[in-house]
């Protein structure tokens, strides 16, 4: 039987999508769309966690995920579908689901049109000093607060 994994062994999570990769993903999804209007929201990130109970570390690790929400508008009907499976077949099914749900939805008398493509500022949303913390460093920081 293999030994259990160490709570302190650094497990690298997949990195969050770059801006270029998010744009490519969005373009791929939009190529599957047949609705009058389609909005794609991409959320990608990584996080580290360390949990304590009874004055001891109980879990520690890294989590990485990318989710995509497709919002389809057909006439005056709108619906959305979300996935975190990013292969073409899954993305196609997600677009199809959003479009089918939109067709089933009642007309929205207050529906506003989508804004269209937007320009976003580049921001520093990741700090290497925080992102690079090891499990040991997170434990030391938590112990300093708990003690």
Regions found by a protein language model. Give the residues of each.
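Active-site bordering "gate/hinge" segments
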Residues: 1-147
């Amino acid at each position: 039987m293999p030994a259990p994994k160490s709570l302190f062994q650094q497990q690298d999570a997949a990195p969050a999508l770059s801006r270029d990769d998010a744009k490519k993903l969005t373009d791929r999804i939009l190529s599957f769309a047949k609705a009058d209007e389609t909005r794609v929201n991409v959320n990608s990130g990584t996080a580290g966690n360390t949990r304590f109970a009874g004055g001891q570390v109980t879990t520690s690790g890294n989590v990485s995920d990318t989710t995509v929400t497709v919002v389809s508008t057909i006439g005056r009907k709108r619906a959305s579908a979300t996935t975190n499976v990013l292969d073409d077949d899954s993305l196609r099914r997600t677009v199809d689901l959003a479009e089918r749900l939109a067709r089933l939805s009642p007309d929205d008398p207050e529906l506003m049109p989508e804004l269209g493509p937007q320009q976003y500022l580049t921001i520093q949303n990741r700090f290497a000093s925080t992102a690079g913390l090891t499990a040991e460093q997170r434990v030391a920081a938590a112990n300093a607060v708990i003690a």
